[in-house]
Regions:
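Selective transmembrane helix interface/packing segments
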Residues: 1-175
Length: 175
């Protein structure tokens, strides 16, 4: 039974990650001609396009992506409750676990993105790759305020380190 729980939780977490990544890429105005962005769009289109017919965007906010994130997180929490034999709580008690799951996935997404961004900048500084372009677009809105507070030391940008520490602290507090 634990193998089934692991597989279901992993698949739903990956689905939530990909749809959340699409929302973040739209929010940061990533270049959707980038091959990685195109892959995310192709993977998420079966979920997003039917919702978009019903839920048009409101300003810059893609409501279809937001609703997809909420739906997948709700299904994820429901499956976790069901597979662990906890039953289904009343609707109002779902709000906190669903929002916690979304926040946790968002934080892990940014933690991973910032780590990869810092690693790529150390391995190939000034180089270009589709991954590096997407990571820069995602990470800069988070790293820019930290850079204003903590300047580079001897040419070494420590903002990714501080961002990772802050994200880890928030993840620990969420336990």
């Amino acid at each position: 039974m634990s193998a089934i729980i692991f597989i279901v939780e992993t698949l739903l977490s990956l689905a939530l990650f990909v749809v959340l990544a699409r929302l973040l890429l739209q929010w940061t105005r990533a270049d959707f001609r980038n091959p990685l962005c195109q892959a995310v769009v192709r993977i998420t289109n079966p979920i997003i396009l039917p919702l978009r017919r019903v839920l048009p965007p409101v300003g810059k906010l893609d409501t279809a992506s937001v609703v997809a994130v909420l739906l997948i997180a709700t299904v994820d929490v429901a499956c976790i409750f069901a597979l662990h034999g906890l039953g289904f709580p009343p609707a109002l008690l779902w709000v906190r676990p669903v929002l916690t799951e979304i926040a946790r996935t968002l934080l892990w997404t940014y933690l991973s993105a910032i780590f990869l961004y810092a690693l790529l900048s150390l391995i190939a500084p000034g180089g270009y790759s589709p991954l590096q372009s997407v990571l820069a677009t995602l990470c800069e809105p988070v790293l820019r305020p930290i850079r204003r507070l903590i300047p580079a030391v001897a040419g070494l940008d420590l903002s990714p380190l501080w961002a990772i520490i802050a994200i880890q602290a928030v993840l620990i507090l969420m336990r």
